[in-house]
């Protein structure tokens, strides 16, 4: 891989059905964890119209920039004028099972299923814990991803590593598991 290709900022799209919690969190996490090497996006097959208030509150509490976060349809990323994605990750089982649009540029994709914190209907403490758990799982997986030696991996090896990340328990690193 050329140095120019290694230096290019990689576009990463995170998908879930409602685009209100997990995919929004992942977009914010990779913006920060990616250290300028990755640009995060998120979308949903049936977007809720706005990020979940608990998502925004948690991200603000953790000092993420939430200024540009919004709930949007994955159709925004399937058109000719959309930014070309290098990676597409589904973060919910519903989106993982849906027929996704054909993404321009043939990005590498993987499923990283995370339980939906917005589905928690217990006490405020349980809801808060569900959002924190989802954030932690996403941050762990994204941290592993952004630290992969991408320039040294062929497409098939990279696909295997991305699939392995999706199957990791939230406390494991696939490199040591």
Region annotations inferred by a language model:
Residues 44, 92, 113-115:
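Residues at the C-termini of beta-strands that transition into short coil/loop
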Residues 2-79:
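Conserved active-site segments centered on acidic
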Residues 83-84:
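Alpha-helix C-terminal capping/helix-to-coil transition sites in glycosyltransferase folds
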Residues 47, 95, 116-118:
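Residue-level detector of flexible, active-site-proximal loop/helix-junction positions
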Residues 20, 93-96:
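Short glycine-rich anion-binding loops that position phosphate/pyrophosphate groups of nucleotides
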């Amino acid at each position: 891989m050329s140095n120019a290709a290694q230096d290019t900022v990689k576009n990463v799209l995170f998908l879930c059905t409602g685009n209100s919690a997990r995919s929004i969190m992942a977009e914010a996490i990779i913006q920060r964890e990616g250290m300028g090497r990755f640009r995060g996006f998120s979308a949903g097959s049936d977007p809720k119209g706005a990020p979940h208030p608990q998502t925004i509150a948690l991200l603000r509490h953790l000092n993420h920039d939430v200024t540009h976060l919004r709930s949007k349809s994955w159709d925004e990323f399937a058109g000719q004028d959309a930014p070309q994605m290098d990676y597409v990750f589904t973060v919910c089982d519903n989106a993982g099972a849906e027929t996704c649009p054909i993404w321009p540029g043939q990005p590498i994709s993987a499923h990283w299923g995370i339980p939906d914190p917005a589905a928690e209907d217990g006490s405020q403490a349980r809801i808060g814990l569900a959002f924190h758990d989802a954030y932690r799982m996403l941050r762990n997986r994204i941290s592993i991803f952004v630290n992969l030696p991408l320039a040294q991996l062929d497409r098939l090896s990279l696909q295997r590593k991305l699939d392995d990340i999706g199957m990791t328990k939230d406390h494991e690193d696939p490199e040591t598991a």
